[in-house]
Every structure is written in structure tokens, then in C-alpha cells.
Regions:
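Terminal amphipathic alpha-helical/low-complexity segments used for targeting or macromolecular assembly
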Residues: 1-69, 124-128
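Flexible, glycine/small-residue-enriched loop-and-beta-strand segment within the central core
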Residues: 76-86, 91-169
């Protein structure tokens, strides 16, 4: 089977997303996961900062994986959450955004300052590639997107306001 046929006809939109292929971010399965993450993040951001047990419960449900001693200061924002993996002894300061359409892997002893943005998603620069073929109902996919993972190594400090683009490895 031709790779292009396999990607277009066999892979789910989530599989395409994680493989860095063009995918439809308006896919119903992806939207369901996205809405679930938004609800969990809202709950986390509204939980009293002293209620560490509830914050831990939410993070365990939201994130793809995490080590010991993770501290995330609210507010913070994600797309899916389940594509984010933290090592041990990590701290994320307030107002950070993780667009985890692909994997974001953060190593041990990482510090992330306020207002950091980590992006794994990007759009094709050719407008014709951003909008796919019409769906069976005649509508167009919302927008075709691609992704690349972001890897942050052990003992890395990301300074305030940094923007980390798709496909970047630090440390």
C-alpha cells in the first residue's frame, strides 16, 4: 500500500497528528479529547492552591505521565494534556501554555518561568494545503495542521516569556 494512501485512508486523525502528518484538527475524536482537557484545566485553575490533593488528582488524569514533585502554578493552559510528560522535580510557573498536539517531554529538574509558551502545532504556509478536500457533507475541514514534538532535557531552565516552537530540543 502506498504511504500516502495509508496516511489518508487508514490512520486516524490522532495517529496523523502524533506522526507529524497533515491532520484535521476539527476531527470529532480530537475535539472530544480537547474539550475534556479544557474541563480538567479549568478545574485545576479554579482549585484552591492549598488543595494539593485535588490538584494532584487532576494532573494525574490530565497529563500523559509525570514523575515525583511536579508543581504547576495556575493558571496554565493545554490543548490535550495527555501528550505532556514531566520528569521528576519540575516546576512550571504561572500563565504557561502547552499546545501539545504532539509530545512535549520535559526532563528532570526542569524549571519553566512565567508566560512560557510551548507549541508543537504549525500550519502549512501554502493556504491550499491548510484547507483539505470537502467532507462528505460538503463542509471543509476546519484547518489542516501538522506537528513536531518538543523535548526539554534534564536540568533546563526556560526563562520568562520564552516561546518554544515545534520540533525544538533544548538541553
Amino acid at each position: 500500500m502506498d504511504l500516502a494512501v495509508y496516511v489518508e485512508e487508514i490512520m486516524t486523525e490522532r495517529e496523523k497528528m502524533l506522526a507529524g502528518q497533515l491532520y484535521d484538527c476539527g476531527d470529532t475524536e480530537l475535539l472530544s479529547q480537547w474539550h475534556k482537557a479544557k474541563d480538567l484545566v479549568r478545574d485545576y485553575n479554579q482549585t484552591d492552591s492549598a488543595d494539593t490533593e485535588e490538584k494532584e488528582r487532576i494532573l494525574n488524569e490530565l497529563l500523559g505521565g509525570r514523575g515525583k514533585n511536579l508543581w504547576i502554578t495556575a493558571p496554565f493552559y493545554v490543548d490535550y494534556g495527555n501528550n505532556i510528560y514531566f520528569g521528576n522535580h519540575c516546576e512550571v510557573n504561572m500563565n504557561c501554555t502547552f499546545l501539545d498536539d504532539n509530545v512535549i517531554r520535559i526532563g528532570n529538574n526542569a524549571l519553566i518561568a512565567p508566560n512560557v509558551q510551548i507549541y508543537t502545532a504549525f500550519h502549512p504556509t501554502n493556504a491550499a494545503d491548510r484547507f483539505g478536500k470537502p467532507k462528505e457533507d460538503g463542509s471543509f475541514p476546519f484547518c489542516k495542521t501538522q506537528t513536531a514534538p518538543v523535548i526539554i532535557g534534564d536540568n533546563v531552565w526556560i526563562g520568562g516569556g520564552a516561546i518554544i516552537m515545534p520540533g525544538v530540543t533544548i538541553g
